[in-house]
Amino acid sequence: VGMRFDDRVTGRLDKYAKQAKLIHLDIDPAEIDKNVKSTVPVWGDCKETLPMLTALVDEKKHTDWLNTFYGYSKQEKEIVIDQELHPASGEITMGEVVEALNELTNGNAIIVTDVGQHQMVACRYAKFNESKSNITSGGLGTMGFALPAAIGAKFGAPHREVVAIIGDGGFQMTLQELGTIMQAQVAVKMLILNNRFLGMVRQWQQLFHDKRYSFV
């Protein structure tokens, strides 16, 4: 419903959900069949089309299917989460940093993330006690977003603590906003996670482009 089937969701398109029948609902006709061929394309506002579609199908429990995903979540904890939060190498991970931030803020801060690997980790592990507390550039993926957005968040909610989590690459793109912070005396905290690369771009080049690294 309303998705672009971009590579952050699908991974390699030539291997994505080959066994699945896809019903794709989207208000923009240009998105339908653009990246993935749909079995049933539905063009229109999902506020109208989704109720019309669900009225035609019977409710199912999908117990076995859901249990399979519960099993995958256990694997994710063992293979990904435990290694990020309790690494054996001794080198601090981004997950550990975000967990430490949770302890300091008690989930009460507004967390603004830039775009990159740190964004994925922050959105996975950051804890929030209130709504409207997680600000990120999720759709457009604009590097350099966090610092100016954090300034705006502090002006919008001056009574709340605002923390910007930024990668070393994204920080270089709008670091001139430090001048704005000093001029306007904006109390924004910055947490810079340096992975020494444009990490997510490099990761995609590693996974999908035979490690042909360029401009990372």
What are these regions (language model features)?
Residues 16, 32-43, 47-53, 121-216:
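Thiamine diphosphate
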Residues 73-154:
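Active-site diphosphate/adenylate-binding microenvironment
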Residues 24, 112, 165-166:
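Generic enzyme active-site microenvironment
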Residues 1-69:
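Glycine-rich, acidic loop regions that bind phosphate or pyrophosphate groups
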Residues 9-13, 100, 177-180:
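A short acidic, amphipathic alpha-helical/loop segment
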Residues 2-6, 116-118, 169, 195-196:
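Short glycine-rich anion-binding loops that position phosphate/pyrophosphate groups of nucleotides
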Residues 4, 90-95, 170-173:
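Active-site glycine- and acidic-residue-rich loops that bind
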